[in-house]
């Protein structure tokens, strides 16, 4: 059995745009494929609920040798401050926290591998769960700085 505690990571970058403008970008999940190294596309389940807490969206992820889709629920949506979603409702929580900075906005991307995700991996992968969890953790650690750099480039290009 693996450690079922929450695994977390976060990194920040300063972006030369306002918190509201940056929020408008990162909360548009249909643009995720422009900056994510893994998620190639996202779409809202119900356009009328898009961007609101409780709204659901699907994402398509690709890594060498594997493609899969996820369903996520928006769990935080406060313009200029935070946008976050939970994959599968309780498996992994991703978020973007925004704070005014002297020169623009500090954008912090957060990642939490939740106990529900650990349990699912243990059920699905058995003895291989620790390796699979380590692999997904490494993908997040590698992807976050790449994602932040891409968001900065896109936001500052206007």
Which residues fall in each region the model found?
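Solvent-exposed residues in well-ordered beta-strands and their adjoining turns
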Residues: 14-18, 60-64, 99, 110-114
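Short amphipathic alpha-helical segments with heptad-repeat character
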Residues: 16-19, 23, 134, 138-141, ...
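Hydrophobic ligand-binding cavity/cleft-lining segments
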Residues: 1-52
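Residue-level detector of alpha-helix boundaries and kinks
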Residues: 7, 17, 59, 129, ...
């Amino acid at each position: 059995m693996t450690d079922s505690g929450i695994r977390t990571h976060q990194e920040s970058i300063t972006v030369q745009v306002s918190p509201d403008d940056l929020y408008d970008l990162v909360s548009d999940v249909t643009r995720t494929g422009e900056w994510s190294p893994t998620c190639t596309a996202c779409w809202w389940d119900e356009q009328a609920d898009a961007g609101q807490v409780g709204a659901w969206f699907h994402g398509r992820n690709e890594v060498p040798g594997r493609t899969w889709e996820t369903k996520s629920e928006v769990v935080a949506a406060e313009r200029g401050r935070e946008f976050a979603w939970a994959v599968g409702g309780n498996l992994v929580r991703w978020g973007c926290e925004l704070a005014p900075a002297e020169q623009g906005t500090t954008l912090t991307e957060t990642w939490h591998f939740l106990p529900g995700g650990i349990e699912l991996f243990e059920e699905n992968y058995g003895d291989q769960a620790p390796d699979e969890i380590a692999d997904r953790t490494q993908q997040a650690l590698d992807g976050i700085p790449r994602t932040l750099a891409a968001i900065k480039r896109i936001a500052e290009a206007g």
